[in-house]
């Protein structure tokens, strides 16, 4: 485990994704178990078994030279390797563990307004559960990983087994912000930015990035969630006043009030004040639960292999039952 830690996978991660369910501290002194653990480590880090067995040789996460890093500040590509690797491994486990037959892949339209029109929902406002339900129905999983190597990233979209997977890794629980990040990552798919072997990795949405791909993805996400018209601007300065006006805009224009506030925060750079305003709207919690519930409706943990269940233990939340996908 020390070599895995040196490779960027700390003890708590190694304990979840490598060691079997029945493992306890007493097993560490049983040499007969070593071959199985070596095999598990080799499979996880994608390394030759001979290298894993050479105790004097260092282990490392695979290189991902094709990964496209966006909105990254002061982090070298190599340091994100372990987090990218774990995200891909968990994404693969989710695809393999789908409840029933994999649905046909239907990528959302390149026109964000058309996707918004097609998306089933119970009100004029597009919210996180609407985005999640539509993506899973299209055969595109969304997973939120809690146990991640550091440094990590906010969101990644990758192609696994021929279909996109959206991977979230920061500890956000704000539904509107998570919906924006998810739609942003989907934009990288519909615009052709994300290809097999070339995941798009966004470290943090508040980090500036003038790349055309990021501008397109931001605009796509805004249009999906808010519609074709520009998000009405807020002019208030006090967080409670911001929240009140944003709530009025939601009622008038059908745009999530928290999204209105976050748009103001991005325009002004007042992200801390925007967070206070979203809190005043009681909009800071519930995102993790919504993502977990959508996951549980579509993934069969009971039917998953032991190694896939281990990888999927890294996700936020506990299994909430086995409802049939709707």
Residue ranges and their predicted role:
Residues 1-326:
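Active-site hotspot residues in diverse enzymes, especially metal/ion-binding acidic/histidine motifs
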């Amino acid at each position: 485990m020390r070599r895995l830690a040196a490779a960027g996978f700390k003890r708590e991660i190694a304990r979840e994704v490598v060691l079997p369910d029945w493992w306890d501290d007493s097993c560490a002194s049983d040499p007969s178990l070593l071959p199985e653990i070596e095999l598990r480590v080799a499979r996880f880090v994608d390394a030759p078994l001979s290298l894993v067995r050479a105790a004097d040789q260092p282990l490392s996460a695979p290189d991902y030279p094709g990964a496209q890093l966006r909105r990254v500040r002061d982090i070298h590509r190599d340091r994100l390797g372990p987090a990218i690797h774990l995200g891909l491994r968990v994404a693969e486990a989710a695809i393999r563990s789908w409840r029933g037959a994999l649905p046909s892949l239907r990528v959302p339209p390149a026109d964000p307004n058309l996707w918004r029109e097609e998306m089933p929902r119970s009100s004029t406002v597009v919210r996180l559960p609407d985005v999640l339900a539509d993506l899973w129905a299209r055969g595109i999983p969304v997973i939120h990983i809690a146990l991640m190597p550091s440094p990590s990233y906010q969101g990644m979209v990758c192609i696994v087994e021929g279909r996109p997977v959206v991977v979230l890794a920061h500890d956000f629980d704000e539904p509107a912000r998570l919906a924006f990040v998810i739609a942003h990552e989907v934009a990288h798919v519909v615009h052709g930015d994300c290809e097999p072997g070339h995941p798009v990795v966004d470290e943090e949405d508040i980090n500036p990035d003038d790349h055309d791909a990021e501008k397109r993805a931001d605009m796509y996400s805004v249009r999906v969630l808010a519609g074709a018209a520009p998000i009405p601007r807020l002019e208030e300065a006090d967080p409670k006043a911001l929240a009140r006006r944003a709530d009025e805009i939601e009622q008038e224009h059908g745009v999530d009030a928290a999204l209105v506030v976050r748009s103001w925060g991005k325009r002004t750079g007042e992200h801390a004040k925007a967070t206070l305003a979203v809190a005043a709207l009681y909009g800071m919690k519930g995102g993790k639960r919504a993502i977990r519930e959508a996951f549980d409706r579509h993934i069969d943990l009971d039917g998953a292999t032991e190694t896939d269940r281990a990888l999927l233990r890294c996700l936020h939340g506990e299994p909430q039952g086995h409802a049939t996908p709707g």
